[in-house]
Amino acid sequence: MKVVDKIKSVTEQGQTAFSFEFFPPKTEDGVENLFERMDRLVSYGPTFCDITWGAGGSTADLTLEIASRMQNVICVETMMHLTCTNMPIEKIDHALETIRSNGIQNVLALRGDPPHGQDKFVQVEGGFACALDLVNHIRSKYGDYFGITVAGYPEAHPDVIEADGLATPESYQSDLAYLKKKVDAGADLIVTQLFYDTDIFLKFVNDCRQIGINCPIVPGIMPISNYKGFLRMAGFCKTKIPAELTAALEPIKDNDEAVKAYGIHFATEMCKKILAHGITSLHLYTLNVDKSAIGILMNLGLIDESKISRSLPWRRPANVFRTKEDVRPIFWANRPKSYISRTKGWNDFPHGRWGDSHSAAYSTLSDYQFARPKGRDKKLQQEWVVPLKSIEDVQEKFKELCIGNLKSSPWSELDGLQPETKIINEQLGKINSNGFLTINSQPSVNAAKSDSPAIGWGGPGGYVYQKAYLEFFCSKDKLDTLVEKSKAFPSITYMAVNKSENWVSNTGESDVNAVTWGVFPAKEVIQPTIVDPASFKVWKDEAFEIWSRSWANLYPEDDPSRKLLEEVKNSYYLVSLVDNNYINGDIFSVFA
């Protein structure tokens, strides 16, 4: 979806749109750390995020890779910067074709900074001289597919700012006229260069309107987190620093925490003034850190850490090809990135109902599904690599996870448990102690308000429902006992399969069971989570392989603990259990 349309949708609901900018880190570890920060920031619901291109086009390939993961794995509407620096038309078109094929629809068109080692911008042979040329090219070749954003400079472009820190009136007006040419050529959004004097920004907006620039103008807000970094960035951009800001920072310039706290306060006051003058969007330059951006938005009342809203129980895709997707199997609830990877080859995605046409189309397992950031790998090492002398030791690790003592799980990409798990974590702890090793669960919910903490989704005004669900590993003996007991509970349905594909079930192999649904005003019933036997058979290969790839392999090859985990993998069953009585059922009764 185009960013300008998303901003319009948000502001028409009387809300303030906000967004975040990131840049490509220099190291592989830095990239993985960035994705973890992105995940946290995206949970607050930004309208979009953007990723920079890098000075002189130096990070082109990495920017393309990060942009694709942002759109398709982090699931946030992504805008990619694209510059003219060192970019002949062939490379520009390659970049545009790449992001289009990855479902990205938004570009920030820039001239770019001079190449490394040069003071002035130099047009590369076969390339463009300015952002206007780039806008014209994108519109000419790609029509209306891309949303095009351009940069606005409240104090004029740094190239025309004089030694005294000011642009001449003629240079300023010329800069405005050039901005209008970019908009007239097809740009539909303006994001500004950083500034610290809000009066300058407000004058800039008014001046734009006076000459017929009517598209949204989004202020770029750069939080101050480090004094030297602040001076360096302001100097590079030739940004005016108000006297009161200098006076406030000078006494605390050597105290980074004090500078950061004041930076949050100052940016908050800037934003309050901007919003009070009718501006409805904010763009935060994060510098790849999250605390200042979160602090500003919390001060403004735009986010509340205790009330993070969800449009669905899982993060809605941003890829233009998946925007209508609203149904998924519950099995990947804790591994959404793996699910996206295994379904990226689909031409159509379930909308409204699951149907039975997709089960055979999952991609095969690859190393990607088991790759982990080093930070998460370290956490698993710390929490899960202990001597395992018996199955009781294995059960104890699962119990610790369920009662909240562990923050990682080999079977989850998430940090800690889902918030709703706290409702049933005591019961989960008991059944894990008894040999039912849970990896996925949800409590029953009957007509809870859709904005309820922990279990709500879909926004206010609706009601949500859930059937209780448990997914666990257990021995054949325990499965046999469970099957026998379940005969006294007609509302319970189950499926079980082992690594050798021995199948036990009391449901039909084509029976799809909706286990989460919501009812909202003037809408059809939404059922975003289902249990599907065909998908369960696909998931079981991944679930069993995790015993080896994500846990046993953390031990030395000849370690007895590793041998025990492999024995569990090869002998246990994976079980999916649903209590279809969501009104007064008790899924844990069958374990009594």
Swiss-Prot record:
Q: Which SUPFAM superfamilies match?
A: FAD-linked oxidoreductase
Task: Name any one GO molecular function.
Answer: methylenetetrahydrofolate reductase (NADH) activity
EC number(s) in its UniProt entry? 1.5.1.54
> Pathway of this protein?
One-carbon metabolism; tetrahydrofolate interconversion
Q: InterPro entries given for it?
A: FAD-linked_oxidoreductase-like (IPR029041), Fadh2_euk (IPR004621), Mehydrof_redctse-like (IPR003171), MTHF_reductase_bac (IPR004620), MTHFR_C (IPR053806)
Where are the active-site residues found?
A: E21
Q: Which cofactor does it need?
A: FAD
List the GO biological process terms: methionine biosynthetic process; tetrahydrofolate interconversion
Assembly and binders: Homodimer.
Which named protein is this? Methylenetetrahydrofolate reductase (NADH) 1
